[in-house]
Amino acid sequence: MARHLAVTGEEDPCSLYLRDILFGKLPGYKCHRHKLNHLGQAKGILRGGNMAVFHGLRGTPYDIPPEGTILFIEDVGERPYAIERMMYNLKLGGVLEKLSGLIIGQFTEYKEDYSLKKDLYSTLDALVKEYDFPICYDFPVGHVTENLPLINGAEVEFVSGKKGVELLINPPI
């Protein structure tokens, strides 16, 4: 987010959202519907971030507890097979089945690996299609120009609907 501020300036919409958060005004985000989204709604604690960093914390005291979590993931510069492997780690480790929701953000600075026979989002979708919780793809978070600020540990309401995605950040109790 710091790089984002330096590159886009303080009047950029994402910078304004960050300023609002810092001054106690919590945003609600709405974005487009992706064709792979899984419809549904959930409440939970927003946790996540960079997939490689998150993966490196697995099995440590800093690992994210999956129960009641709406997990968001993004990454930069990782190869698709590495992202697939990290997602398999979450699946086989029992993390995915305990989530309340999954927000798949932007994966940038990589080249599609056509040996996987499908694009990255389709590869990830094959690993999560069995779950009942809401899932959205292409959420504007990550190392991108439209990088919405998210609050790790915030209670959120997440809706993946036919007309789009909504993420509401609730005030702390």
Locations of regions flagged by a protein language model:
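Conserved beta-alpha junction segments in alpha/beta enzyme cores
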Residues: 45-76
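Conserved anion/nucleotide-ligand pocket segment
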Residues: 1-57
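ATP/nucleoside-binding phosphotransfer catalytic cores, i.e., glycine-rich phosphate-binding loops
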Residues: 109-173
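Solvent-exposed alpha-helices and their adjacent loops that cap or buttress functional pockets
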Residues: 38-39, 46, 63-65, 95-96, ...
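Internal helical hairpin/lid segments
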Residues: 65-119
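Buried hydrophobic positions in well-ordered alpha/beta secondary-structure cores of metabolic enzymes
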Residues: 54, 102, 153-156
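Short, structured loop/turn "capping" segments at alpha-beta junctions
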Residues: 25-33, 63-68, 97
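Conserved active-site and cofactor/substrate-binding residues in soluble primary-metabolism enzymes
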Residues: 9-13, 45, 49-52, 78-85, ...
